[in-house]
Amino acid sequence: MSLKNKLAIFDLDGTLFDTKDVNYNAYQNAIRMTKIDVKIDYDDFCKLYNGKNYREFLPKIISNISEEQLKKIHNLKKNIYQEYLDKAKKNDLLFLMIEEIKEKFYISIVTNASKKNVEDILEKFAVKNLFDLLITQEDVENPKPSAEGFLKAMNYFNISKENTIIFEDSEIGIQAADKAEVDYVRVYGYN
């Protein structure tokens, strides 16, 4: 029986890892592979789209995109993501903190990223064992800014809002934390 009675929830992109170059290159390559003639502006991607659900931002980049094209680009991106993982950077300070609090806190990731991409990056950096629960885009009906993922993590461990803390970098993550009525720490540095 575990003596843990607290939960720390971490976002992945921009919080635990700087993945903007990984995501940018993977999406740009996936779009090119579908023969759609669109170039994503790097600065726009970093400021406006990185960390957001593909269903939210791809239609803003590619006008009149069909559901089939949307899914194809996303599936291609998931499959080529690991080719660019050398561009990812780990937030060493947060990982040191996780190691310090792990005895008293359950540690979870709640992210809009795909399960495959989350597992790829955790394996690349050999840190998967630090996390008790991964909640990815496939595990929720409503991605951030919905609070669904955070609430799911709290319910899974039966931990109250008062004993939960969320680490987020993006505005949509902060909105989700507010909706869940959970205290949060805004992580700066990558975005």
Locate each region found by the language model.
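Substrate-recognition element of Asp-dependent hydrolases with the DxDx(T/V) motif
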Residues: 94-123
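Metal-dependent phosphoesterase signature
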Residues: 59-96, 105
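Alpha-helical substrate-recognition element adjacent to the catalytic core
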Residues: 33-64
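Short beta->alpha linker loops
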Residues: 22, 49, 53, 76, ...
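Active-site neighborhood of HAD-like aspartate-dependent phosphohydrolases
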Residues: 1-44, 179-180
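Conserved SAM-binding loop
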Residues: 16, 47, 107, 142, ...
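Asp-based, Mg2+/Mn2+-dependent phosphohydrolase catalytic module
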Residues: 1-6, 115, 120-191
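An amphipathic alpha-helix signature
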Residues: 24, 28, 51-59, 115
